[in-house]
UniProtKB/Swiss-Prot annotation:
Ligand binding ([2Fe-2S] cluster): C51, C124, C196
Enzyme class: lyase
Pfam families: ILV_EDD_C (PF24877), ILVD_EDD_N (PF00920)
NCBIfam families: ilvD, PRK00911.1
Enzyme Commission number(s) from the entry: 4.2.1.9
UniProt gene name: ilvD
Residues annotated to bind Mg(2+): D83, D125, K126, E448
Protein known as: Dihydroxy-acid dehydratase
Amino acid sequence: MVRVRIRSPSWYDGVDNAPHRVYLRAVGFTEEDFSKPLVGVAVSWSELGPCNYHTLELARYVKEGVKEAGGAALAAPTIVVNDGINMGTPGMRYSLISRELIADSIEAQFNAHGVDAWVGIGGCDKTQPGIIMAMVRLNLPSVYLYGGSAEAGWLGERELTVEDVFEAVGAYYAGRITLEELKRVEELSFPTYGTCQGMFTANTMALLAEAMGVSLLGSATPPATSARRRKFAVESGKAAVRALELGIKPRDVVTYDALYNAAVALFATAGSTNAILHLLAIAHEAGVKFALEDFDKIGKRVPVIAALRPAGPYAMQDLDRVGGVPRLLKKLYKAGLLRGEALTVEGEPIGKLLERWEPPAVPEAGVLYDVDRPYKPHGGIRILWGNLAPRGAVMKIGAAEVLKFEGKALVFDGEAEAFKAVAAGEVKPGHVVVIRYEGPKGAPGMPEMLKVTAAIVGAGLGESVALVTDGRFSGATRGIMVGHVAPEAAAGGPIALVENGDRIVIDGEAGLLKLDVSDEELERRRRQWTPPPPKYKGGLLAKYAALVSQADQGAVTTPETCQC
């Protein structure tokens, strides 16, 4: 039986630590338990939405696996901010911030209590990168477990996801559907607990965790309601103890090659643009140099081979049915696009795991494609550069039918006013909606713009109106949408200088984001521009705004970026 204990003896062994042991005896520890490795279980649990509603149950299965492998497990909670509920509200400012809070809270709890290894259970969007950031920060043997996607809904023969509800709102305001039809979509689109069903941010990050090797192969796609989800919970508990025994730590796994593989998987699935922000943050925590330029190079080599929403018609449960992430990764590996030598938490390189893995005898049925005959020839996301984004911006070209667009700027200093303009019919074909002061510092918190983007698409303007912002997008976003513009407006980026009527050029093929205004005119505007005062003078949002870096740096909170 495993008895590797790398930290817990300093907390719990010997006469001097008798007062420490008494607290664990009070919660059920036996004398034998104190000789076992102490394995923490970080549970992001909440009843504020379906995404993490069931994670306490999964934690019990993880603890079973730890016990079977010879460890002693104790669970501790961390927070959840449900992006879908706070979309388009002041609450969205807390979404990205929660990623940092989750990483910080896990660091505090597990460093304070001397755990030897741990398992992190995530669900909703920011819980996953927050947990993985904590993994590489603590660098203790650890495994990530995804809570799983909700099942898709159905309206007749039409498969529904939460994306349909957001777009139905825009369709209602445009007079394309009735209130009764909107209500029907609302009632049917989310029938179970679990995360949003398409290749949106939560499912994207789960897929990338598997591609990075920090979670077990095959564990991303089983639905939240599936018995296989519980099986993976047990196996994840065992894997954490095994990683402790083998001495495998997250920084052995999260290397440049692992991040490279994650980026390949991201582009191949046209996943959420949020993943770029999160992978940059994970790289920062791991001490790995991985920048927007790396994404730019990788994205030009990788086609989209998964027809998953919002880029295609299928949901996560459909990918699971045809073999899940392993089938996707094996296609990429056989095509020479993955770095097979990257180590995984299972103790073997990902290439060896994929070579052994055999796909189910199920046709791919249009869900997955081959690399040489892809679903879309270009990668799902393109990095844009230009005088409007000197430090880069991102465009989800896999979910856009129009890759090149030129139009006149319609400028809003915030998302709320932009949504009102769309709902009132003031946004017309040929407009480039510019939403600024919604970046990491400016909002603060870099909120997602799904309410506006879905309203644009729902109004039938998805191919005739573009949107450019220093904020973020939901993984459910589609259309001509450019986000993460850096530097942001609040930091004096060129987006702060855009005026109504300015011509903006977007070229998703060439990777260009250009403001068609002379350098002399921009300099004149800059001399007249003054930075806005902080929106908050106290509390969490004020602290975050003072610490956070720009989007091209992952929007991490570090002493180096502190404006204290």
